[in-house]
């Protein structure tokens, strides 16, 4: 069976501030019981749900509007999706006071802009009627709203610039983990909106949202026949269980996801995260003029472009798709990478080619512990560049950049194989490896993971990565997580507070996703 890496081309290079919308309706499923025989909750779930979402866990101020049709096959529509990143370039990294000030200045204007993108009351009423007709029902809220759309506003609408628009059914927001003050900015705003609109609040876990992002992408794209071969009648992918490699500037975790709220951490970082390690290595490796001219502090992304300057075409060539419509990185980019075939090869030191004379050691090369450690290689990179000084040529810097990323990414992969060896039962259910978080946008990482999975006997495992705009922090993933938690019957108390640390693993100090106080079952 041919190995695959799923990434939806529609999202590959699209700017973040575009509005993404699906355009096809659902096929008619089996008839539902008449509306007068259903509970209020069943009737609510028979219509399209809409949420406004806020993400402020670090230095990105993000707002999104997302809707989803009823049921597990409901279509997803992203009406608004924007973010503003604080400018911390003068500090060489994220500077909390600057990030907080940016949230204070940016969040309200973004929300005001998002409200103008709310679906009109008439448009949503038509959508509700279509959903009800498809379910075998009739009448109800949709028809009534359609009649009233041009008249006085009702409890289900907001008047924005004189136009009746659908009011969100609930507000979603990041509760943690993250910077406490930054989280509080978003949570306070979300509480205010939920109170003013008299709708529920969904305060969700940031890492859970990263893990669920591919399901959001599946729900958004599976209805568009021009970009996806998947049918609107298929379940949202990936289906549980699956493995998730969460890689960002703040976290590095290998997670076994068994359900919406059941996630077990198999391996995690002992110190800094892989994204932080890449940023720090980039500060030492990249030429000073390149660092000075870069417009933000995402130096890890700049390191990839520096290491592989020919690997960034404006758009992927059409021939880069395989027979399933998935992108084949072997065809897209020639990294000249040969994966280690055995453990003895993956723990061998990297010796720089002549005329260079330095060595890099793989992280934890002398240990089989289920953990990640990125400090050691960072120290070696710093020593190499310090000893060379200004005499280090561009070619040597590029060689060091490639070797550094290679060893970091192989380290990520080795813990996957060690975890599978420690729990053979995981091999039987492993069909999908999700890679999510900011570092997942690194194409060389995807190439290394795919190659290593293939040579270790896992060609059948689908490697799924969100498009770059959804790898980094964003509010769309928060909206989707809120949507899934809401449909599962959960909501948050208005008394919830930020969680600086909040593990998704139930064995953690916080007790997992549902272990923190404030969750409650929605009333029917």
What are these model-predicted stretches?
Residues 1-49:
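N-terminal mitochondrial targeting presequence
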Residues 47-167, 173-177:
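N-terminal beta-alpha supersecondary unit
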Residues 60-67, 212, 244-246, 252-256:
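Short beta-strand scaffold segments in enzyme catalytic cores
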Residues 142-159, 305-433, 442-454, 514-524:
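A contiguous, well-structured pocket-lining segment that forms one wall/lid of small-molecule binding clefts
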Residues 173-199, 217, 443-453:
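Short Gly/Thr/Asp-enriched flexible loops that form oxyanion-binding sites at enzyme active sites
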Residues 199, 204-242:
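Conserved phosphate-binding catalytic cores of ATP/NTP-utilizing and phosphoryl-transfer enzymes
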Residues 203-204, 432, 449-478, 492-496:
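Conserved phosphate-binding/catalytic loops in two-lobed NTP-binding clefts
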Residues 485-524:
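Acidic, glycine/GT-rich loop-and beta-edge segments that sit at the periphery of enzyme/chaperone cores
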